From Swiss-Prot:
Any one Pfam family match given in the protein's UniProt record, by short name: PD40
Alphabetized UniProt keyword annotations: Cell cycle, Cell division, Periplasm, Signal
PANTHER family according to UniProt: PROTEIN TOLB (PTHR36842:SF1), PROTEIN TOLB HOMOLOG (PTHR36842)
Gene: tolB
Localization: Periplasm
Lineage start: Bacteria, Pseudomonadati, Pseudomonadota, Gammaproteobacteria, Pasteurellales
Subunit comment: The Tol-Pal system is composed of five core proteins: the inner membrane proteins TolA, TolQ and TolR, the periplasmic protein TolB and the outer membrane protein Pal. They form a network linking the inner and outer membranes and the peptidoglycan layer.
UniProt record similarity statement: Belongs to the TolB family.
The keyword Signal is annotated on this UniProt entry: yes
Signal peptide residue numbers: 1-24
GO CC annotations on file: periplasmic space
Protein task: Part of the Tol-Pal system, which plays a role in outer membrane invagination during cell division and is important for maintaining outer membrane integrity.
Protein name, per record: Tol-Pal system protein TolB
GO biological process: cell division; protein import
Length: 432
């Protein structure tokens, strides 16, 4: 089938838009947690064309599964055989290595495009018979969509083996503060793994806090380009920008509602920093918080009914939650400095910063778990399937992006090499 027919227009405009490519990309560097993950084999895909293959599809798939923290693809040199279809798979040879699933496939040139075909094979008979195909598919893509095609395979394999939707076709937005230059501040977007990076906006003045719209077509962020803080919403397809909030005082921390109709943000327009919600259709604004304390960093629950936010009303920053329509707030965090709260996709937990590390609080039991061990962690953002958390931390004299799994076992870095990288925001799903 044609993979392009399954893409939303947002994915096409990422490449067609008049946005500027970035010179240096971030890449995932794994620190710990893979060795204890589930072993799997992704056999090199057979290339059915002349010369060398235009991309190593199997390597991309293996990297995706490894980055999830749930799988540990074995090295090619440890593979007992190199099958390219289910008929060539020897289940016993793989089962002897503790491998219960094998991905095989091939890539074939097709009239200027490329056909990617794969099969996921059960090697231990978990579904009844060893050697059974668990799932299979094929896609025809152009050269620039080869990585996307590989990510599609990864998503399908991941979901089949875990029951959780894959998030390898998502993107991240972040801020880079470059070393020198007349416009050192940049809003950038890349694939979740750092590839295909481009610049959304450059500025001589600070840029902060990018946030995705529900459909992935727009970014909201804070800009100081007019010598004051203002909230900007930018269309990623056309590049068109609109200032939606430029009140006196500070305007910051934008967050789109799950349905995209509202934008929560913080503003000190009346002297104290409070949470407001803007109806993006009418422009009408309602104030959610009040009192003498500062309230900021709003984020939405998955159902759009609750706002999680940070407030110093008790004397130190703590995480609270309240109804998105207003009313009283309840304390989520306890003890120490806590901020940057965000609810997980299933609504069962809140991820936040507590004592400068990433912490997960289970809302049912009240138990907390420290997930990170890095230094001065900030701005956590959760993948749409809830498996991974991206955040920024201090490394040396600068800021870098970090990844940690929601169970705290897998850890990785996305170091930048042309400036400080901060304020990461994980996109929603970009496919149907």
């Amino acid at each position: 089938m044609k993979l392009v027919t399954r893409m939303w227009s947002i994915l096409i405009v990422f490449f067609l838009a008049v946005l500027q490519p970035a010179q240096a990309e971030v890449r995932i560097v794994i620190d710990e947690g893979v060795d204890s993950a589930r072993p799997i084999a992704v056999v090199p895909f057979k290339w059915n064309g002349p010369g060398s293959a235009p991309a190593d599809i199997a390597d991309i798939i293996a990297a995706d599964l490894r980055h999830s923290g749930k799988f540990n693809p074995i090295p090619v040199n440890r593979m007992p055989q190199h099958p390219t279809s289910v008929s060539e798979v020897n289940p016993e040879a793989w089962a002897a290595l503790g491998i219960d699933a094998v991905v095989v496939g091939h890539v074939t040139p097709a009239n200027g495009s490329f056909n990617i075909a794969y099969q996921l094979v059960d090697t231990i008979g978990a579904t009844g018979t060893a050697g059974t195909v668990l799932t299979q598919n094929q896609y025809t893509v152009t050269a620039k969509w080869l990585r996307y095609g590989a990510h599609t395979v990864s998503d399908e394999v991941f979901e089949k083996l875990t029951g959780i939707r894959g998030a390898f076709r998502t993107r991240i937005a972040y801020i880079v503060q470059k070393h020198g230059g007349s416009q050192p501040y940049e809003v950038r977007v890349s694939d979740y793994d750092g590839f295909n990076q481009f610049v959304v906006n450059r500025s001589a003045q600070p840029l902060m806090s990018p946030a995705w719209s529900h459909d992935g077509k727009k970014l909201a962020y804070v800009s100081f380009e007019n010598k004051k803080s203002q909230l900007v919403v930018q269309d990623l397809g056309s590049g068109a920008r609109k200032v939606v909030a430029s009140f006196n005082g500070h305007n910051g921390a934008p967050a789109f509602s799950p349905d995209g109709s509202r934008l929560a943000f913080a503003s000190s327009k009346d002297g104290v920093l409070n949470i407001y919600v803007m109806n993006l259709g009418s422009g009408q604004i309602s104030q959610l918080t009040s009192g003498t304390g500062n309230n900021t960093e709003p984020s939405w629950s998955p159902d759009g009914q609750t706002i999680v936010f940070t407030s110093d009303r008790s004397g130190s920053p703590q995480v609270y939650q309240m109804s998105a329509s207003g009313g009283g707030a309840s304390l989520v965090s306890t003890g120490g400095r806590s901020y940057s709260g965000q609810m997980t996709a299933d609504g069962s937990a809140i991820i936040m910063i507590s004592r400068d590390n990433i912490v997960k609080k289970d809302l049912a039991s009240g138990s907390t778990e420290v997930l990170s061990s890095t230094f001065l962690d900030e701005n956590p953002s959760i993948s749409p399937n809830g498996i991974m958390i991206i955040y920024s931390s201090t490394q040396g004299l600068g800021k870098v992006l970090q990844l940690v799994s929601a169970d705290g076992r897998f850890k990785a870095r996305l170091p930048g090499n042309d400036g400080q990288v901060k304020f990461p925001a994980w996109s929603p799903y970009l496919t149907k």
